[in-house]
């Protein structure tokens, strides 16, 4: 094995996504052969003594992938959040997994739980343009002008313009409407801020797809393990360069066996 960047080795050992591992390095919590290291340095785990917070770096783990349906009111975090339930509470037997594609507290839907730092990077970094698809319930139906502005990109606070997105009205819902949105980026609370800029209000937000992986028939709080073939297909979907497309059928079917569900107490 040749030398690898520290954040890659750390992610492979299940310490989190590459971005999270980079933050550990920046914070001075990582050393190689007794010396603090800087971001971008490399090491060989066969010969170098790599430590995080003074503890030896564990060997690379066998990769694991879980599709999880995060309910509303559950925090997309591994750390305790007072009395609030976290995604770790929903998959208590998968302590070394971390969430990829976080959702805010009031949003729901698909989250990937994994210890594969490389896949996590490809699913979340904007340069890979991995598609995420959402169903969004708006308090009132948007007009065509609002939809067109959303499709072209909306200027957010600070002057940042969002990337083009595929947006269409799916069905009416009283005075409001369900809207389908496909995006190649996913900044924190981006859809909610876009809606606010357009004079709209989000009532409900559900993510139904990440790359080739669909939420499928998973109910809130349930999770299922992906097969190796599904994981490879998901990784391959991060290389796609075609224009965003709305899903018409499951690309990864939600298998009924091996479904986990947190029992209510």
Residue ranges: model-predicted function:
Residues 1-265:
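Basic, flexible Lys/Arg- and Gly-enriched helix-loop patches that mediate nucleic-acid binding at interfaces
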